[in-house]
């Protein structure tokens, strides 16, 4: 992976399971991505309204 480009990529993780959310966040942060998380759709929608993310990882089974 080209880690120089990863520095500038911002990713939003939307996951209600804390252990999975933390694992994804730590893994991506280790690769030098800027990572934000949300555990509800509402929280994610507020973050999306304020910032344009390069990638959103969304739990499709979110309650």
Regions picked out by a protein language model, each given a short descriptive name:
Residues 59:
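Active-site residues of response regulator receiver
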Residues 22-30:
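Charged docking surfaces used in two-component/phosphorelay signaling
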Residues 21, 63:
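The feature encodes the CheY-like receiver
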């Amino acid at each position: 992976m080209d880690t120089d480009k990863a520095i500038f990529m911002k990713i939003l993780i939307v996951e209600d399971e804390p252990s999975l959310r933390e694992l994804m966040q730590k893994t991506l942060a280790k690769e030098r991505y800027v990572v934000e998380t949300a555990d509800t759709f509402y929280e994610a929608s507020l973050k999306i309204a304020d910032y344009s993310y390069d990638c959103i990882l969304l739990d499709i089974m979110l309650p």
